[in-house]
């Protein structure tokens, strides 16, 4: 099954300026992500960036670049520009791999593509179980609740589902009902084209989660449990220090 990986790599970052180019053990972070995508068996890999320095780093590593505007409000909007510039057919399977995930396993890149291809659904993504209270109550760890067939009911930074009886007694432990969403998405190119025609939803603005736009407009998102748990993503200088140590 063929699929295309697009890696959005926005240069500006309030917490870590020039994030795609930060050095991780001798390579720019974006090159590590490119290498993980290559291991997935993708037919084509494109780094979508708004900065010439990022483009040069990718090209030196033998990667393909698509220059995009700097004013996109989300990674999916950046993907839509690439979809149009590359004239992908509506049924092309696109996997959005975040440019700040240098430790993402190649297996889950392919997993999300396979999950999408096997279903008549606009969008697919992955999640992993949460086993500790710190993560369950962390607003930076996005939680997702599913229906009986694995489709998302809701994504939230809040602790969902709220375990009423357990939490009335104890906020230090959690049960087996919590899933943390992973920021990897599979879509067909035609779905991306439709997504960017929709106005952002109120819930999307409240939670600051772009996938809520999909649920707001009545579309389904399939969520599978990831075959491997990815390593740390890089959002802060502290994350960067940790990733450098883990990737030695």
Curated annotation (Swiss-Prot):
Keywords: Cytoplasm, Lipopolysaccharide biosynthesis, Nucleotidyltransferase, Transferase. It is found in: Cytoplasm. The keyword Transferase applies. It comes from the Bacteria. Pathway: Nucleotide-sugar biosynthesis; CMP-3-deoxy-D-manno-octulosonate biosynthesis; CMP-3-deoxy-D-manno-octulosonate from 3-deoxy-D-manno-octulosonate and CTP: step 1/1; Bacterial outer membrane biogenesis; lipopolysaccharide biosynthesis. One of its GO terms (cellular component) is cytosol. Its EC number is 2.7.7.38. GO terms for molecular function: 3-deoxy-manno-octulosonate cytidylyltransferase activity. Coiled coil: none annotated. One of its GO terms (biological process) is CMP-keto-3-deoxy-D-manno-octulosonic acid biosynthetic process. It catalyses: 3-deoxy-alpha-D-manno-oct-2-ulosonate + CTP = CMP-3-deoxy-beta-D-manno-octulosonate + diphosphate. Pfam families: CTP_transf_3 (PF02348). InterPro entries: Cytidylyl_trans, KdsB, Nucleotide-diphossugar_trans. Gene3D superfamilies: Spore Coat Polysaccharide Biosynthesis Protein SpsA, Chain A (3.90.550.10). It is an enzyme of class 2 (transferase). Belongs to the KdsB family. Activates KDO (a required 8-carbon sugar) for incorporation into bacterial lipopolysaccharide in Gram-negative bacteria. This is 3-deoxy-manno-octulosonate cytidylyltransferase. The gene is kdsB.
């Amino acid at each position: 099954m063929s699929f295309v990986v697009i890696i959005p790599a926005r240069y500006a970052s309030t917490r870590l300026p020039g994030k795609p180019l930060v050095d991780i053990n001798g390579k720019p972070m974006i090159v590590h992500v490119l290498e993980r995508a290559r291991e997935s068996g993708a037919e084509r890999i494109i780094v979508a960036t708004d900065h010439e320095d990022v483009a040069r780093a990718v090209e030196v590593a033998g990667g393909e670049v698509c220059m995009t505007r700097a004013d996109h409000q989300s990674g999916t909007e950046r993907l839509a520009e690439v979809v149009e510039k590359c004239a992908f057919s509506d049924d092309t399977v696109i996997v959005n791999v975040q440019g700040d995930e240098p430790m993402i396993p190649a297996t889950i890149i392919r997993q999300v593509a396979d999950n999408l291809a096997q279903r008549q659904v606009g969008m697919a993504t992955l999640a992993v179980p949460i086993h500790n209270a710190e993560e369950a109550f962390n607003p930076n760890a996005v939680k997702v609740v599913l229906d009986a067939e694995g489709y998302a009911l809701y994504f939230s930074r809040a602790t969902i589902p709220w375990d009423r009886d357990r939490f009335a007694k104890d906020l230090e432990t959690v049960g087996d009902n919590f899933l943390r969403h992973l920021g990897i998405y599979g879509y067909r190119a035609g779905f991306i084209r439709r997504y960017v025609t929709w106005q952002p939803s109120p819930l999307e603005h409240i939670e600051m989660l772009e996938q809520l736009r999909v649920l707001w407009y009545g579309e389904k998102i399939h969520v599978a449990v990831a075959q491997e748990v990815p390593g740390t993503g890089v959002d802060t200088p502290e994350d960067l220090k940790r990733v450098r140590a883990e990737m030695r």
